[in-house]
């Protein structure tokens, strides 16, 4: 583990891997457990829920614990979680809800065991953004052929490739850039559609993560509109038209309905802090 930080809901950052304040280990945070119900020949109702873990903090300057505990308590009082970040990439929302002394403190050393509520049930890591800027023939919404027909033809859909390297279906966020009307795109066998107008200079943001599902439109002047109810949900996950459907593993065909650009960010998810974070300068 190279880095460990706690960021409170108001943006205060507590460095938990500094010279004068550090976490001894992340042992309990590396473990995980699924919640499930036994079925006749297997399991059902599978989920990963919030859990508690112990985090041991050591310091050579005990006074710095006061600032840390102030940030921890402010989040609990506001009922707004902070965020733990490991190695600058793996994150989970968390509360610090209690503490106990690991050793008798003295002016130059203290060890405190904190009780952490891990809110999300998983750790998430954002993968590099994939940018897609499809172009159809011409710059308008129709293809103008060099012969007279009763109507011009609609542009053909553009096929691109999305790569999900996680080995499992991935949560994602997407940003669609205007102008466009009722934008939709297809990945694999699912169509992601929102019945909304995205203005020129604006964008639509779609969040399909386990911790947050939202759809908003941001105008050029910065005004934000909540359009959550305009997302097409079909008959739910697996129906082929669910706007929050996780993206399948591997390479999938991406088909875009128009001339709008898409920024797609997928998330790797782990039940516990990944073991590969052990290979670093500070043992954890």
Regions picked out by a protein language model, each given a short descriptive name:
Residues 9, 86, 187-189:
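Structural motif
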Residues 58-101, 253:
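Short, acidic/charged, Gly/Pro-enriched secondary-structure junctions
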Residues 32-63, 108-122, 252:
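Oligomerization/assembly interface segments of phage tail-like spikes and tubes
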Residues 47-49, 76-78, 106-110, 164-168, ...:
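Solvent-exposed loop and beta-edge segments used for protein-protein assembly and interaction
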Residues 131-284:
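Intrinsically disordered, low-complexity segments enriched in serine, threonine, and glycine
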Residues 22-23, 81-128, 267-270, 283-284:
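Short beta-strand and beta-hairpin "edge-sheet" elements
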């Amino acid at each position: 583990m190279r880095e460990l930080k706690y960021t409170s809901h108001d943006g205060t950052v507590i460095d938990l891997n500094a010279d004068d304040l550090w976490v001894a280990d992340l042992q309990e945070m590396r473990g995980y457990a699924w919640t499930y119900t036994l079925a006749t020949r297997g399991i059902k109702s599978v989920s990963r829920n919030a859990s508690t873990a112990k985090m041991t903090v050591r310091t050579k300057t005990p006074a710095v614990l006061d600032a840390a505990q102030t940030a921890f308590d402010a989040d609990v009082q506001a009922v707004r979680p902070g965020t733990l970040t490991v190695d600058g990439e793996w994150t989970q929302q968390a509360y610090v809800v209690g503490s106990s002394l690991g050793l008798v403190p003295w002016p130059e050393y203290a060890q405190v065991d904190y009780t952490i509520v891990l809110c999300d049930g998983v750790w998430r890591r954002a993968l590099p953004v994939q940018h897609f800027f499809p172009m159809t023939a011409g710059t308008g919404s129709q293809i103008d052929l060099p012969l007279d027909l009763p109507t011009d033809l609609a542009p053909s859909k553009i096929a691109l490739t999305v790569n999900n390297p996680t080995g499992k279906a991935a949560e994602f966020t997407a940003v669609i850039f205007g102008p466009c009307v009722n934008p939709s795109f297809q990945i694999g066998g699912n169509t992601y559609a929102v019945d909304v107008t995205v203005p020129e200079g604006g964008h639509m943001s779609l969040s399909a993560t386990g911790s947050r599902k939202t759809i908003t439109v941001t105008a050029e002047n910065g005004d934000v509109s909540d359009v959550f109810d305009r997302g097409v949900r079909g008959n739910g996950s697996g129906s082929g038209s669910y706007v929050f459907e996780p993206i399948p593993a591997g390479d999938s065909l991406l088909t875009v309905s128009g001339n709008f650009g898409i920024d797609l960010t997928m998330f790797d998810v782990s039940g516990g802090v990944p073991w590969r974070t052990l290979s670093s300068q500070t043992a954890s």
